[in-house]
Amino acid sequence: MPDDRALQDAVIRALADAPFRASLEWRRRALADPDRVERYARFLARHFYHERIVHFFKYSRALARVTGRAPEGILKSPAFDALLPGIILGSRDTAAAVARLVTAHVAAGQAPVPYLADLLRYEEAMMVVEAGARVWRDGAPSGGAGSGERFRPETVEGTVLLELSFDLPSILPKLLQPWTDVPQAPERLTKLLVARSAHGRVAVARSDESVAAVVHLADGTRTLGEIAGVAGLGVEDLEATLQGLVDLGAVRFSSGS
C-alpha cells in the first residue's frame, strides 16, 4: 500500500495536472469520484488563472473602461474551456496559452490606445516568465561574474528581451492612478529585459545593445573573454553587465568542462 504522503501527492498532482488526471495511472487508483475531481480541478484552474491574470494584466484591467475588455473575461469563454483538458497549473506552456487568449481578447476591442499592443506584449511576457518550476531550497552557489574563466555564463531559460515602440515604464504607474484621459506613453524605441529568479521573483529592467548582445551570447559554452570579444566590451564592463544580469535572474554561471 502506498503511504499517506504518496497518496496526497497523487491527489494534488491530479487536481493540478489535467493530462495526469486523464491517465490510466491515475484512473486505475480509483481514489475519488472522477466527476467530482474534474469539477473541483476546473474550479481551481479558473481561480488560479484569475489571480494571475488580475495581477499580470493589471494595466489592461485599468484600461478596461476604454477597451471594453476585462482581461479575466476569457475565463468564461469557450476558448478557455478548450484549454482545460491540457492545463497544468503553474506550467510555462499553460501560462503562455492563457496569456495568448487574454492578449487576443483585449486587442479585439480595437480601442484607440496607441501603445496597447506593446502593453499586451509586456504583460504577456510577465505572466509567462513568472511561470515554471521553482527552486525551494538554496543550493551551492554557482559563482558570480568574477568567478574566473572556468565559469561560463548562461542565459536562464524563459528570460525575455522586448523591443517596444513606446516607453511603457514611464506611464505604467499612471495607469493605476485615477485618470480621466488615457495616460499617453512617449513614442520611442524601448528595450526591456524580463527575467525571473530561481525562487520566482520577476524583475524588469531597461536594456541596451550591449545587454542584449550578452544575453544572446551567454549560452553556457563561451568564456567571459570570448563573449567580451564578440560583444565588443571590455572584460570589466562585461563583468559589471553580467553581475547585473545575475542579480536580475537573467543569467547564471555554470562550470565549463
Question: Which sequence ranges carry the predicted segments?
Answer:
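Long, charge-rich, low-complexity alpha-helical segments
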Residues: 1-147, 197-257
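Low-complexity, glycine/alanine/valine/leucine- and proline-rich hydrophobic stretches
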Residues: 152-219
